[in-house]
């Protein structure tokens, strides 16, 4: 801290008096916690050993802190100075030794006090310590070079402290972090965090190396500390307090109780201890988190009484400002590691699900001072139940959450996983969802910049990098190893497990697999805690150990206007997969759709979500990602969608992509429209060998088909069947799905469907054989479609009908060709025969083949865009129009054949026109005969006119459908893009 001058409100007490003062305090007093630097953070847990009495560790219990104030090498109580046990919680054991001042704990200059054990011996002993002495995962902290070995501290001219990282300092830091937990709700504007704010790099973490900060005033010379060790250690700490330079010379630096607070602005009250953070990059001595002296310490550290969940272990007894001053709340509002829920022993399993924005903001501030405002009301004596953990839900905490509901529900001490899931699924897309984006997802997705554990706070763009570094320094050292172990053990997709109560429970009660706790430390062996635990974004929902109760869920909530891009994993694959993604969806319909897919059994090898967010810095990028994702469906059907008609089969394969984004709603509207069978939309039937023809609507009614095939100009998207541009195109059905034309077959221009009769010469045999095999296979296979059809006309039925039509047409073609060969027919009749046969072959090779492929697709369970039966019916109706045209030609040929291939009708037709002009010219005497003559012609002509009118009407409907299809083709993509 800044200057610790004697006039700070308590007289400077030399370290030699620290023992007596702390002895006065009695068992309530605690040893300060000295944290090692965050230097090379070893993955295996380190356990700090007491300085005096190395062999003093009971295998099953923590080193009892009640061993009495056995004087350590420095004259301080060994138990206090070293933190008799690896216990990370201050008051775990009733008999803990009295506090010794941080100065005692901090390495004194060489020659001051009894020499400590060599750091190497301490290191060896620590390595030999049992892995979990007291059932806690004691947070391992590797000593920085300054703290670990001799050598003058950088910022101090004094001799180096041999071991500046005592377990007491570790405990102190843990304690401070707990206090920080308790006050993690105080999230106001970070404006006044100057003291421990961005410039904290100037603060040397511990006495080992004090980097004179910009405002630190350089070495201790500027701050006349009480003792050189006192002053050495404090200088190291406030050496980093860059923003305190203005306070360097004034009396505000004098610590109240042996200079615990140097920063007048918010440290006026002794309500917290500053955990001096060092930017993660700086090597240096460990942090010295000093406990207050004597009476102040009794107030500030209270034993956990009765395990009441409402009390923050670290903060319940936090001394209220002895001088009545209150810390400026604005200064310390955000100084919490936001591990708050963890600090509450009684937190329920769901308690870890805190407001994500709170977490995000909280993790950026690691300073442990707590606003005096919230606690100022409590007596300085500090009752046990003073600071309930539920204060996490109060005021600014909820403000940060932006959602009181989420704050209350998340803050509730014991939230059942069901309740949590219910809240998550019912909560609308409010700040909580966005917070979940910022909080839940990034742990898995942010590459953590090689900083252990919580070191990288989730920057929401408003938190400065220096604060992140400070948080990384403190929280990384405190929670790095344990979090990496917990996250790796659980393989959680999103939530910071460290946030959850179980982290503290594991540390506090040593219950690595308590019933209430997730098996945080269930697999510590398998998890070598990575120093730079960068949570790689695992693309599939990872498995969670069986004991997990409140499975965190990653919810990549790309909240956009449509929000179909909302991917959600449910971390635990419970009996009913809960999708928490419904919250972010704009409408309940979309949410319901997302949840409908939830119970789908997880696939063996889950497909990565379509939206893989590598980093989620903020909501804007999510919006951009959502927009990118929205754009895709506008140019075609999204390939990875679950077909409503084939949900049973496809949902397993495509669980995470919930369908066409914007067409999700449009599909249903179009599906309703498509019930009118003839409301057709064109799709040209020209040879599709060229990809460019996919978007061209030809006007030839003979080459138009499809009631409800609306073609968007969409190039084939990579899908289950990677289409080749030469063969495939995507036809978007108005009913539901885009399906790929050219399904398994290349377009064979004159190919006719396999028929028993001899096929015309142009028909290629292989194509027919392939289709025959498909017909046989399709006829044996039941239509695999989940869509209930209003009529029994399914793909199989249509194939049968189509086969009958094809056989009839082919029979006519063969008959006419034989007639042409057998008889010497006039050229006009031959032209008619060629016209009829050519039209028939064209029809068979294109429209019939296309419809046959549609029928195949409707029966093929592996086909991706399964045409609905309504689509088949509409196409069949349009196909009947073309068949009718061909049939008329053959009927005419049949008449000619019946007339011995004499062109009778053409002669009569020549006669027919004259009667029309002759009517007015003829006299009234003749008309009877002519009427009798004309009556036959007239009837014939009227019938022909009616037929032509019917054909024109059909072709007009067809062309109008084509035009409407063109317009739809133009506008629907725009609508989708707008949406």
Curated annotation (Swiss-Prot):
Quick one: where's region Disordered?
1-20, 52-95, 136-169, 182-291, 400-429, 537-581, 741-790, 908-940
Does this entry carry the keyword Cell membrane? yes
Ranges of Pro residues compositional bias? Answer: 540-549
Q: Which residues carry this modification: Phosphoserine?
A: 58, 406, 409, 412, 416, 643, 645, 932, 935, 967
Cite the record's Basic and acidic residues compositional bias ranges.
1-10, 190-202, 769-779, 927-940
Q: What spans are recorded as compositionally biased (Basic residues)?
A: 221-246
Q: Name one GO cellular component term.
A: postsynaptic density
**Which ranges of the sequence are coiled-coil?**
none
Record-level GO BP terms: modification of postsynaptic structure; modulation of chemical synaptic transmission; signaling
Q: Among its keywords, does the record have Zinc-finger? A: no
Give the record's membrane topology. Answer: Peripheral membrane protein
Its chief place of residence is membrane
Family assignment from sequence similarity: Belongs to the SAPAP family.
Subunit structure, interactors included: Interacts with DLG4/PSD-95.
* Database matches in PANTHER family: DISKS LARGE-ASSOCIATED PROTEIN 3, DISKS LARGE-ASSOCIATED PROTEIN DAP SAP90/PSD-95-ASSOCIATED PROTEIN
Q: Which protein are we looking at?
A: Disks large-associated protein 3
Q: Which gene encodes it?
A: DLGAP3
